[in-house]
Regions:
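Predominantly soluble domains enriched in secretory-pathway, periplasmic, or organellar proteins
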Residues: 1-192
Length: 192
């Protein structure tokens, strides 16, 4: 996955033998692939960032049993995603070289019904304060979800916590470019 060969973006997902770590096959998907998530039905959701010109960001679905693309979701732009049960939380930060601007969107896609449940999972207007979403995670125990904001990539970012219904519970300033979140059930020591 990745977009390191502009304009000749790679467009394949590699299937790896975990015993030998060798590529068994490649699956042709779409250009500039970025992230993958597996649902409970054996489908792999793959984000494509497009080419920032005429090919827009979208989501592809691979059936892990057949290693075939079974769905292309052009109306679901996708930079980053997280899955919890049947809900695929997706945000997109789409850059356009035509307009020299970002288009940011948020959605929840239902992996069971194959329908978009909502076009904005943040319901209290907080999304207007988030400049560049850069990470997302869902607490599997509580359903709370977290979105990070990289802001301008050179100043401290922000971590937002939202309730299941999309309302901001709290936020905290982070280091630069916050991207990843981990959950644990072990009690951690407080930083002094």
């Amino acid at each position: 996955l990745g977009g390191y060969r502009v304009p000749n973006y790679d467009r394949t997902v590699s299937v790896i033998d975990l015993n030998t770590f060798k590529v068994i096959k490649t699956i042709d998907v779409g250009i500039n692939l970025h992230r993958m998530e597996l649902d409970q039905y054996g489908n792999i959701y793959v984000s494509s960032r497009g080419d920032y010109y005429d090919t827009y960001s979208e989501t592809f679905v691979i059936d892990s049993n057949t290693d075939k693309v079974i769905e292309e979701l052009p109306l679901l732009p996708n930079t980053e995603m997280a899955i919890c049960r049947d809900s695929l939380y997706v945000y997109s930060t789409e850059w356009s070289y035509y307009t020299n601007s970002w288009t940011v969107s948020y959605a929840i896609y239902n992996t069971k019904t194959k329908k978009t449940d909502t076009r904005n999972f943040i319901t209290d207007g907080t999304e207007k304060s988030i400049k560049i979403p850069y990470g997302i995670a869902i607490n599997p125990e509580t359903g709370e979800f977290f979105v990070t904001d990289a802001k301008d990539y050179v100043t401290p970012g922000t971590l937002y916590c939202f309730s299941r219904d999309g309302k901001k519970k709290w936020s905290v300033i982070t280091g630069d470019i916050p991207a990843h979140i981990a959950f644990t059930d072990k009690k951690l020591k407080e930083i002094q």
